[in-house]
Design a protein with these regions (language model features):
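N-terminal intrinsically disordered/low-complexity leader segments
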Residues: 1-28, 213-221
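Helix-turn-helix
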Residues: 2, 32, 39-74, 78
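Generic hydrophobic, amphipathic alpha-helix propensity
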Residues: 29-37, 54, 79-83, 87, ...
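Hydrophobic alpha-helical connector segments
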Residues: 78, 92-121, 172-175
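Amphipathic alpha-helical packing segments from all-alpha helical-bundle domains
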Residues: 88, 104-107, 137-162, 173, ...
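Secondary-structure edge/capping motif, primarily at the C-terminal ends of alpha-helices
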Residues: 98, 134, 186-190
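Amphipathic alpha-helical segments used for helix-helix packing
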Residues: 117-140
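Hydrophobic/aromatic-rich alpha-helical bundle segments in the mid-to-C-terminal region
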Residues: 141-146, 161-221
């Protein structure tokens, strides 16, 4: 389940300190390349941005670029991995702010996503965008996308299980569908649709939770 902060990490430079140990660039130069790629890939699209354009934006030589990222696809994988790590860290922070209150985490997520997905500069979910540009489901880029989607469903299922739902995984999959739709609606609708996107996500999410609530389970979200 992607926290609202993911929208900010998607089109802003990815700070190496936010990327997590598994994807932290090996050097400041690699971090600069990754930051330049993050801005360009998200704003203009992956296929539309050449390696030469990233090299120019990062102000590095071709030799330096390819030393850190042997191919453009390797750079795309590194970028998406950094975004995924930042999103997971952001959700960890939200959960830490509401210990033991899964309902509060879900409600806060709905409100935050409505705001973030409608702000100027938002270009949709970077993982959905990447999947649209890489048709081969076996491509390494699609593998990163698939892993992040599994994480979203698993995280949402954990929160929903805490609410006593009889099918938390099924409910989680439905919430992720709502999340995807909200991000598209926010991108197309713009800032003036923020309240509507948040309200729709909140109300539809509550309906999903209600539909999967085990009989006799107290209403907490």
């Amino acid at each position: 389940m992607t926290p609202p902060a993911a929208a900010r990490t998607a089109d802003a430079p990815v700070d190496a300190a936010d990327a997590g140990p598994a994807v932290r660039p090996a050097s400041p130069v690699a971090a600069r390349v990754l930051a330049a790629a993050a801005r360009l890939f998200y704003s203009d699209g992956i296929r539309a941005v050449s390696a030469d354009r990233v090299i120019a934006a990062a102000e590095v030589s071709k030799v330096t670029f390819y030393r850190h990222f042997p191919t453009k696809d390797a750079l795309v994988v590194a970028w998406l991995s950094a975004v995924a790590a930042a999103e997971r860290a952001a959700l960890d922070a939200v959960r830490a702010a509401h210990p033991g209150d899964a309902g509060a985490v879900l409600r806060g997520y709905a409100e935050g996503l409505g705001t973030e997905s409608c702000r100027p500069g938002f270009r949709g979910c970077p993982f959905i965008n990447a999947a649209a540009e890489y048709a081969d489901p076996d491509h390494p880029v699609r593998a990163v996308v698939a892993e992040h989607r599994r994480w979203m469903v698993g995280t949402a299922a954990t929160l929903l299980a805490d609410l006593g739902l009889d099918d938390p995984v099924g409910a989680a999959e439905e919430l992720v569908v709502l999340r995807d739709g909200a991000m598209v609606a926010g991108y197309v609708g713009g800032p003036e649709r923020a309240a509507a996107v948040a309200a729709t996500l909140r109300h539809a999410g509550a309906a999903v939770v209600a539909a999967h609530r085990a009989p006799g389970t107290p209403r907490t979200a």
